[in-house]
């Protein structure tokens, strides 16, 4: 399976491209600010056709280019209904500093939006089966996307957005955030995964569930 990613924009949100192999359909996860140029190069180099845009949550650094990517390639954008409103109001609750960053920018919904309203659902996109788990805490509509046996050595992967990072967890002091919900989501939806599961977060380096279980200071004493 082809998996690649890059940090997009001033807030360095990780945008990911996932495809069964070159020359097939692709899934785009969290296309952030200015992602289109790098995305086009990856798509052209590997002869990929976007089949879907997946959003882990609605904050601006993760959805900035979603409408442009979705409408340019004629593919749907998938988002949890609790965060859908942020497609047109992506700075909701983020404060004046972020508002200054996007001064003058205009956001609208993609022409095709699909709501991820069933926790634990599985969808087939471009020949790839994606499992969706609702993980409220960072936002009410945060989700993680799991793909089984995705790596070259058949390890599972999980796109965690801003729920879980290398040695950190998502912030919960923004509108819609809840520390209690975040920890419950991590325990119930992430710490139940195999230690070998590769974590592809919304910011920073990749890691594994096992490494975070052992070394993440915010998860000390948590288990299921």
Swiss-Prot record:
Domain of life the protein comes from: Bacteria
Residues at which Zn(2+) 2 binds: 61-62, 162, 203
E.C. designation(s): 3.-.-.-
GO molecular function terms listed in the Swiss-Prot or TrEMBL record: hydrolase activity; metal ion binding
Keyword Zinc: yes
Cofactor needs: Zn(2+)
Species the sequence originates in: Mycobacterium bovis (strain ATCC BAA-935 / AF2122/97)
Matches recorded under PANTHER family: HYDROXYACYLGLUTATHIONE HYDROLASE GLOC (PTHR46233:SF3)
Cofactor binding note: Binds 2 Zn(2+) ions per subunit.
Protein name in UniProt: Uncharacterized protein Mb2612c
Residues binding Zn(2+) 1, per UniProt: 57, 59, 138, 162
Family: Belongs to the metallo-beta-lactamase superfamily. Glyoxalase II family.
